[in-house]
Amino acid sequence: MANASLHGIKTDLDGFDTGVYSSRNDLWYNTYELTLGQQYKFEKNGLRLSLGCPLELYSQTLDDRIRDDKDSYVHLLVTPNFSAKYEWLDWSADANANYSKTVGDPGGIYNGFIMTNYRSFQRSYVEQLSETDRMGAGVGIGYRSAITATFLRISGNYRYTRDNQIYGTRYEGATSVVQAVDQSTESNSYRLGFDGSKGFDWLQAMVRASGDYSYSTSERLIDDTVYPFHSSTVSISAEGSITPLPWLNLVLNGGCSWNTSRTDGSSDYPTRTVRSAYEKLKINIYATKQLTLTASVEDNYNNLTVKNRHAWFGDISAKLKLEHVDLELRLNNIFDQRQYTRVSYSGLDIYTQTSQLRPRNAVLSVRFKLL
């Protein structure tokens, strides 16, 4: 496979003090790719092996007319991957490993500032292309039985990333400047999870549970200082449904999670744990073959929400199916919840997303069957 592309970046910026750096960009670059894909497979007696080793010749040319700088780069990229799976009766086991290397876009080493929004500016502080190495491995074991309606899987994986550049943010009052610096950085991540379910013929019942633990280490550049940090996340969820009567079905599910990030050996950025949880109960009543009544109530909790940490939601609906017409009446947001806030971690940053909701309302839908 062959691919070629041509690019250009030409910008100018007024009204922002760029200091000794240029406020203009006039950058032109081309990329050329030639890829040879290779895949080998072996299957015998429940064992399946796969080995891939694609080769890519990646060439780039760069012409920065502001700095009068012309360069060319040639890279031979090898991205091997391996997977194995073995099945025996209702059991299965699998493993995988992969390695990849990517080279950054020449457009990422422009010298002048670019305004990304009215408070954010971006500039590259590097003289070479970014190079990122990624390695990963994972294992898993599973059990599936359609006869007993039992399903279980336990898995774990590891990921390693190395980059010759580190990215960060420099704050100047109400504005921020995204910067990339020629300094190598590494990150590691580990994950262990499980997921299982069991069905029961009696009362048409089902239970399911899942859990996940992840831990990662990385580095962050903030105001020209590199902060090593680590993050951890624990999440657990469960679900169950039962039909005790032919006309009654109950569904209950819920879960909780804990997310923490902390810098290593520094108190400049104190640790805060984001804790969240949710519970939901849904009731389906099949009054007749034509009439179905549904009611649900849900609670969402977050410990960092300033107000209303418990956000309650509720809905009621009635569906009536006639010969040529379907009628549905929905009562939405019966607790009149006007605002809902989500809080989450990403690296060392805590993000808050607030949604303004419609007040309590009723909707009547009519659907006609033409045939």
Where are these regions (language model features)?
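Exposed, low-structure sequence patches enriched in small/polar residues
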Residues: 1-371
